[in-house]
Every structure is written in structure tokens, then in C-alpha cells.
């Protein structure tokens, strides 16, 4: 699984958001053109700009106009020209400073529950500012706590729409993001100021895991961070107004019901002015913050009150036409957002949607998200272990390999994982898997294992050498025989040439015979020097143990350096011949099982020098 398997596209505005903690000072809108990083499966989080809000004007309209709007108009089932016609008197364009001031006043009126003042401010707004006020009013939904507050804010939203607000896409996208941040912050024990630091660090880590141009990633990261900081400021502002200081209080079931009812009312008013794409992008925006905060969630967050709001929000977005549940599910799995994975599993189940739990398991295992892997297997019923296990073995990710093995793998899965580790020269993983593959399976597939490991080795046969030295068949005669069989397979084109050459040179019967000849030649050369050497220091004058050490210490060191239970055939041949010479040629050609005994004989002769 490649790194770029899941990578989100993040679209934000170029607008610099003010530092004041007024929720009215930031908005979002969709952008057609986006900055895209390398990636495939991931979802897109689309945010954007628009100028901040708000202003103040002496001009106004009859306050009874909005109250007199019919249900037909509120639900936008009549002619859009009706709304436009009724608001002709409001078409005066407010400048930026006026919009900002009006927005601040409106925000203050909403948080202080001064509905009368808020209604008067609505009448002063121009069309652009009305869209801004719609965002502010809708954002306030997630902080409702009483029935009068519900009636007040829903009444304001209706009036804002009646007066001409029409940017439902931006309002939905923005408030979905904010609602997600509210739910996430309710699960945390640290302060909001600490949350900003945690969020920034997590965002940086997430972008580093994505492929793409570094400059574009930095720009996207800065924009996402600004938007998230705005959301946290908005949460902090409302929390302080509710007397919670720098922390977010938990909502009761009754409060959550009010909040979701208010959002549902807004969706009903928007009607068909929200497209399936709008719901999809809002779903994406709601999931995005949860991946940033996932490492800080309390265990069981997905089944607690903090997650109830986001579950209800996501459910309504799916009902509206969001079709990216699986994409967000895969992304959450990749980033180890276990609690979000749980929420999305529940959403999929309730709405009879298919999510690819096996592919998600592959993503989670690739990035070593053990907690998410456990959730996908136990709660999502993921069963496809083979692919993730083999990829983990190829990468040498011992933690993931051990997790799969402990969960229970079939014999063939273990065998294939061993082959994958061997071909990638992941000796540590291969050593862990080897004793767990049943011997009958290894025996039946021994030739195929070595051939496959050699074929995918990329030029290094360290893994193949490890298997042979480890006596992977548990029978030295059988292990040597398998290696010799492959070395002799001159007509088998499926055997990689480098593997065949390696086995012929080191692990075949001919290699054993060559080793014996080499050792014999070394002995004869040594004897020639001993008897006919013209050096001033004659080897013949040295003590016998020292002469043995000079002749055979290099071979002994080479044998000791060779790790594993078996020596290569070539080295074994040299050892056999050396012992025969030391024993006065009285030793017959030994069985392979006696190789270690021969090492003991050689060691005995060498250590005599210390007696």
C-alpha cells in the first residue's frame, strides 16, 4: 500500500481572518478550483473565504415584513423573485467596516439572547451581510441549552432567510465544521488554549504524511489552521458567555435534541437549494476536525454524549445526499481516528451503506494504527488479513505482524508472510514467523518459497540465505537437498538466474565438493611452505598448535561468523576436509548432521595453543 493511497484535498481561502473571537468574523464557501496533493482515495475538505461581516446602517424596513412571510416563502417553494422584490429597499451596499460592526452587534445580541435587537439588526443588513448573519445564527445552534433559546435562534434564522439570505451552502459547510469541533472539544480535559497547540501539531503531522508540493502543503496547512483556530475561538467565546471560562461543558440529552432540531429546521428551510454535493462537502467538513483531535479523545467517546451531536449531524447530511461516507471512513482509518471510525460504522449501519472495512484495515495497518485495526476487526468485522499482513512483513513492521499473528492467521497466510519478509530481507520478521509456520506446510512449499523469495528479492538474497542457514525445514538433509534441487534446475526458467547462481556457488552438492578441494589445496600450500619455505622464520620451527592456528584460524572464524544452524555447502566442505587433515586423514565423509561435531573438533585443535 502506497503512502499516497489516501490523501485529502484541502481548499481554503486566501482571506486572513481577524483575531477577535467573534464568530461573525469568518465564513466559508466552496471553491471550484482546488489545490490538490498526490492522493487517491481521500476526501476533500473545502473551506474558503469571503470578507468578514457586518455593518450598521440607519436605513431599515418594516419589522413586520419578515414576521409576515408565509410558510411557502420560508420553504422556498414559491417564486424566488418574491423574496427579492420584498427586499428591494435593503439593497444598499454596506462597506466592509459597516458589515464588521453590524456582525459584532448581531453576535452580541444573539449571545445575550436579545432577540428584539437581533431582529432590528437583520433589517439593517444588505444581501451579502444577510448571508453572513445566517452563518452566525446557524453557528449559534450548537450552543443552545433551553427551549426559549431554541425558539429565539430558529426565529432569527427564519427572519434572516425571509429577508433574502440565500447562501445555504456556505452556512451548512461552516456550521458542520464548527459542530464537529464542539463535539471534539467536549471530550477533552485540557483547556481550549492547549487544544490549539495540539491541533497545530497534529495538522503538521498529517500534512507530512501526504505527498505533494511542500509549498502547497504549507499554504494549505496555514489555511486549515487559521480556520480551526477560528472555530476554537468561537467555541471559547460561547463558553465564556455561558460561564464555562476556558472549557467546554458537556451537553445534556435535552440540549442535544434542541440543537439537532434547530439544524434540521434549517435544512428544511433550505430545501432543494442544497445539492447532494453540498451535503457531501459538509459531511467532509464535519469529519475533518475529528481526525485532528483523534489522539486526544477519551476512550469510548463515540458511544458517549459528546458524540451524539456529530452522529445526528452526519446522519442528517447522509439523508440529504452525502455520498462520501466510505471515503471519510478510509481516511479516518488511515489516520488512526478510531472514535470517528466507530461513528462512521454506526452511520453506515443505520443508513444501510457499504463501507470497505477490509480496505480500511489495510490503510490502518500500513500506518501502524493498532487501535483502529482492533476496532475494524472487532466492530467492523474485517477479515482480510493476508494483504495487510504481507505488506507489514515486507516493510518489516514487527508490531503489525505480531498483532495479526496474535489475532489468528491461517497457515497459508503465515507462509506467504514469511515469503514476503524473506524476499524483502526482513530477517527479524522472518525469524519471528518461521517457527509459527507448520513444518508440513514448509516442506510442501519449500521450493516455491525459495523461488518466490529470490524472484522478488530485488538483487539481495539475504533473506534466502537466512532461511537456509536457519535450517527452515528442520531437517538439515532436506534443507540442503532443496537448495541443491533448485541449483540443478537448469531447464526451469521460473528460477531467477541470480538465485540459481547463488545456490550453485554456496549451497549445492558441487559447492560442497568445491569447498573440500579448496581446503585440500590450502593444506597442501601450507605444507609446501612448512617444508620448503625460505623465510628466516621457519614455520617448521613453531610449536604444532601454533602451526594449526596459522593454518585453520581463518576457516574457524568464517564458520563462527556464519549465523544460523547450517553452514553453506561450500563452507561445510572446507570444514570437513580440514578436520580430515587434522585427524590424519582418518575421518570419513560425514553426514550433514555431524557438521557441528566437526566444529568442535576444529575448536579443540585450535584451543590447544592455550594449554
From Swiss-Prot:
ANK repeats lie at residues 292-322, 323-353, 356-384, 385-414, 416-442, 445-478. The keyword ATP-binding does not apply. Transmembrane segments: none annotated. Gene3D superfamilies: Ankyrin repeat-containing domain (1.25.40.20). SUPFAM superfamilies: Ankyrin repeat. The keyword Repeat applies. Keywords: ANK repeat, Repeat. Interacts with SKP1A/ASK1. This is Ankyrin repeat protein SKIP35. It comes from Arabidopsis thaliana. The lineage of its organism: Eukaryota, Viridiplantae, Streptophyta, Embryophyta, Tracheophyta.
Amino acid at each position: 500500500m502506497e503512502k499516497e493511497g489516501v490523501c485529502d484535498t484541502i481548499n481554503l481561502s486566501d482571506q486572513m481572518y481577524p483575531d477577535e473571537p467573534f464568530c461573525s468574523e469568518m465564513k466559508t464557501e466552496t471553491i471550484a478550483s482546488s489545490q490538490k496533493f498526490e492522493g487517491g482515495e481521500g476526501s476533500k475538505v473545502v473551506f474558503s473565504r469571503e470578507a468578514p461581516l457586518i455593518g450598521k446602517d440607519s436605513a431599515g424596513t418594516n419589522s413586520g415584513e419578515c414576521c409576515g412571510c408565509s410558510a411557502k416563502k420560508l420553504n422556498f417553494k414559491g417564486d424566488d423573485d418574491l423574496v427579492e422584490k420584498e427586499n428591494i429597499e435593503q439593497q444598499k451596499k454596506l462597506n466592509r467596516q459597516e458589515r464588521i460592526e453590524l456582525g459584532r452587534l448581531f453576535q452580541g445580541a444573539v449571545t445575550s439572547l436579545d432577540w428584539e435587537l437581533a431582529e432590528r439588526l437583520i433589517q439593517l443588513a444588505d444581501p451579502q451581510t444577510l448571508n453572513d448573519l445566517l452563518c452566525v445564527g446557524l453557528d449559534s445552534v450548537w450552543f443552545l441549552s433551553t427551549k426559549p433559546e431554541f425558539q429565539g435562534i430558529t426565529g432569527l434564522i427564519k427572519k434572516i432567510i425571509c429577508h433574502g439570505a440565500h447562501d445555504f451552502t456556505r452556512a451548512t459547510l461552516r456550521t458542520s465544521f464548527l459542530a464537529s469541533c464542539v463535539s471534539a472539544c467536549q471530550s477533552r480535559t485540557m483547556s481550549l488554549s492547549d487544544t490549539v497547540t495540539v491541533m497545530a501539531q497534529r495538522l503538521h503531522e498529517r500534512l507530512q504524511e501526504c505527498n505533494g508540493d511542500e509549498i502547497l502543503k504549507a499554504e494549505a496547512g496555514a489555511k486549515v489552521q487559521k480556520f480551526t483556530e477560528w472555530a476554537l475561538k468561537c467555541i471559547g467565546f460561547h463558553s465564556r458567555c455561558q460561564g464555562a471560562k476556558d472549557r467546554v461543558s458537556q451537553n445534556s440529552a435535552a440540549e442535544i435534541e434542541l440543537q439537532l432540531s434547530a439544524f434540521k429546521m434549517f435544512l428544511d428551510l433550505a430545501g432543494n437549494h442544497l445539492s447532494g454535493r453540498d451535503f457531501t462537502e459538509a459531511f467532509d467538513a464535519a469529519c475533518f476536525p475529528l481526525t485532528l483531535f483523534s489522539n486526544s479523545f477519551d476512550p469510548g467517546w463515540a458511544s458517549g454524549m459528546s458524540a451524539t451531536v456529530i452522529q445526528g449531524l452526519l446522519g442528517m447530511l447522509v439523508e440529504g445526499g452525502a455520498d462520501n461516507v466510505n471515503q471519510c471512513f478510509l481516511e479516518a482509518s488511515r489516520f488512526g481516528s478510531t472514535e470517528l471510525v466507530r461513528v462512521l460504522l454506526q452511520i453506515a449501519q443505520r443508513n444501510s451503506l457499504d463501507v470497505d472495512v477490509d480496505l480500511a484495515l489495510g490503510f490502518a495497518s500500513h500506518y501502524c494504527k493498532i487501535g483502529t485495526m482492533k476496532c475494524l476487526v472487532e466492530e467492523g468485522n474485517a477479515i482480510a488479513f493476508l494483504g495487510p499482513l504481507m505488506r507489514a512483513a515486507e516493510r518489516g513492521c514487527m508490531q503489525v505482524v505480531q498483532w495479526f499473528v496474535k489475532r489468528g492467521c491461517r497457515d497459508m497466510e503465515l507462509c506467504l508472510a514469511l515469503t514476503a519478509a524473506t524476499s524483502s530481507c526482513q530477517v527479524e520478521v522472518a525469524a519471528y514467523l518461521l517457527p509459527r509456520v507448520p513444518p508440513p506446510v514448509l516442506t510442501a512449499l519449500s521450493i516455491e518459497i525459495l523461488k518466490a523469495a529470490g524472484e522478488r528479492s530485488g538483487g539481495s538474497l539475504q533473506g534466502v540465505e537466512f532461511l537456509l542457514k536457519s535450517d527452515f525445514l528442520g531437517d538439515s538433509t532436506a534443507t540442503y537437498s532443496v537448495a541443491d534441487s533448485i541449483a540443478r534446475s537448469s531447464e526451469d526458467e521460473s528460477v531467477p538466474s541470480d538465485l540459481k547462481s547463488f545456490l550453485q556457488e554456496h549451497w549445492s552438492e558441487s559447492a560442497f565438493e568445491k569447498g573440500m578441494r579448496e581446503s585440500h589445496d590450502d593444506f597442501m600450500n601450507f605444507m609446501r611452505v612448512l617444508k620448503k619455505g625460505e623465510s628466516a622464520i621457519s614455520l617448521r620451527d613453531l610449536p604444532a598448535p601454533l602451526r594449526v592456528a596459522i593454518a585453520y584460524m581463518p576457516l574457524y572464524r568464517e564458520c563462527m561468523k556464519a549465523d544460523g544452524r547450517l553452514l553453506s555447502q561450500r563452507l561445510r566442505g572446507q570444514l570437513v576436509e580440514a578436520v580430515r587433515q587434522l585427524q590424519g586423514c582418518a575421518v570419513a565423509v560425514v553426514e550433514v548432521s555431524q557438521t557441528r561435531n566437526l566444529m568442535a573438533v576444529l575448536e579443540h585443535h585450535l584451543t590447544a595453543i592455550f594449554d
